[in-house]
Amino acid sequence: KYQQLREGAYSDIAEFFRLARELGLLAIVRPGPFICAEWEGGGLPAWLKNDFDEELKGLQLRCDNPPFMSRCEKYLTALFSEIRPYFLGNGGNIVMMQVENEYGSYGNDKVYLKKLVDIYRKNGVDAVLFTTDGGGDATVFAGNFPEECLTTLTFGSGVKKGMNRLTQL
């Protein structure tokens, strides 16, 4: 969310990864577009729902919606160009990237997930890609994309139950 508070204005996130690498820290990055429900709008910038912008009318979040996907691609391309030196394959410290967060609780648009993965790969992301979902069958299978991404689960307070479910996948 803080990476792009205003459309086209980006913070200096590369400095964060430079400092982390200098300190010997590895990074798991959640660039989004959606990072978690605990952030207002799931981390999506508020300007995406600007009803006064003609280009954004009809925008639907977290699905294969052309206005949304074009904004995602623009944002991710700008972000990845800044942090590319920190991808593990480039000698950096970014080892994993989350493509979507708990998407199975929201939708099941596999075309959307595939397009996100394609944006990541087109921009040279050289890190393990993953999705995260709750442990129920409906959410796991709706939100994962095992052809391209490692499937991970959130356990909440049910770690034992979650670990048992994970071993069944």
Question: Where do the protein language model's features map onto the residues?
Answer:
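Amphipathic, non-transmembrane alpha-helical secondary structure
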Residues: 7-14, 18, 73, 77-81, ...
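Aromatic-lined substrate-binding rim segments of carbohydrate-active enzymes
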Residues: 1-40, 117-122, 126
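Hydrophobic faces of well-ordered beta-strands that scaffold small-molecule active sites
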Residues: 27-31, 95-99, 129-131, 151-153, ...
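Aromatic- and acidic-residue-enriched carbohydrate-binding clefts of CAZyme catalytic domains
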Residues: 1-9, 13, 37-67
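Residue-level marker for beta-strand->alpha-helix junctions and adjacent short loops that shape enzyme
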Residues: 32-34, 104, 136, 158
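Glycoside hydrolase catalytic-domain groove-lining segments
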Residues: 138-169
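Short, solvent-exposed loop/turn and secondary-structure capping segments
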Residues: 30-32, 38-43, 108-110, 141-143, ...
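Active-site neighborhood of glycoside hydrolase catalytic domains
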Residues: 67-148
